[in-house]
Amino acid sequence: MTKFWIGTSWKMNKTLAEARLFAEALKAADAGRSPDIQRFVIPPFTAVREVKEILSGTSVKVGAQNMHWADQGTWTGEISPLMLKDCNLDIVELGHSERREHFGETNETVGLKVEAAVRHGLIPLICIGETLEDCESGRAAAVLEEEVRGALSKLSEAQKQAEILFAYEPVWAIGENGIPASADYADARQAEIIAVAQSVLARRVPCLYGGSVNPGNCEELIACPHIDGLFIGRSAWNVEGYLDILARCATKVQAN
């Protein structure tokens, strides 16, 4: 059975002590996990090693929020894929809209990072999404296609067989003031993303939805045919919130 991916990125939040408390509580709840759901957490760099160590006896995957494409070199302030592997990480989040808006991330650099992640055995979680302006001007589908193709553009034919994830996060739906996309809208966009990715990879890859996911909409979202998981923000920064959404989704998945 195909698993649903449900996880959270903490962005620039949580001290090491807070990260440990979250990971320990998640580990304590491990006995109640659903076999249908693949859980993951993406802490800040300062906490990845400790969180991975605490969760090492569970099925929870742990990732990083970004990385450079080079293995090493004169890239002050950057983190390399080798460093992430040295921390025993599983996933790396790439191309988030905040990185694109504030730090000069482009489709080209995302493509370089995706190739480096695959080469080093990391699962790239590729974030894509249109702005409100794109949406209102009718360019959403074109923007998403450009981002998907750019992210996959550096992969060799062999690398195209690697495990790859997409996360659709409409820019207007994320953040504290984000407006959640309707389940129908999200599902339609994700169908387009999956189709474009399949045209490049010759297979279907999972596409998660992220954008103001919360306990009130998670069940409707996870029931959509083209939503293969949820990438949760602030609703899951508290471990009780994450466990609540996991439980709601597990019940919905089992009912289907």
Curated annotation (Swiss-Prot):
Query: Which InterPro entries does the record associate with it?
Result: Aldolase_TIM, TIM_sf, Triosephosphate_isomerase, Triosephosphate_isomerase_AS
Q: Where does the chain bind substrate? A: 175, 212
Its localization reads:
Cytoplasm
- Please tell me one Gene Ontology term that the record gives under cellular component: cytosol
Q: Which residues form the signal peptide?
A: none
Kindly give the Gene3D superfamilies that the UniProt entry links to this protein.
Answer: Aldolase class I (3.20.20.70)
Q: Which EC number applies?
A: 5.3.1.33
What does the record give under GO molecular function? triose-phosphate isomerase activity
Q: Which SUPFAM superfamilies match?
A: Triosephosphate isomerase (TIM)
Q: Tell me what this protein is called.
A: L-erythrulose-1-phosphate isomerase
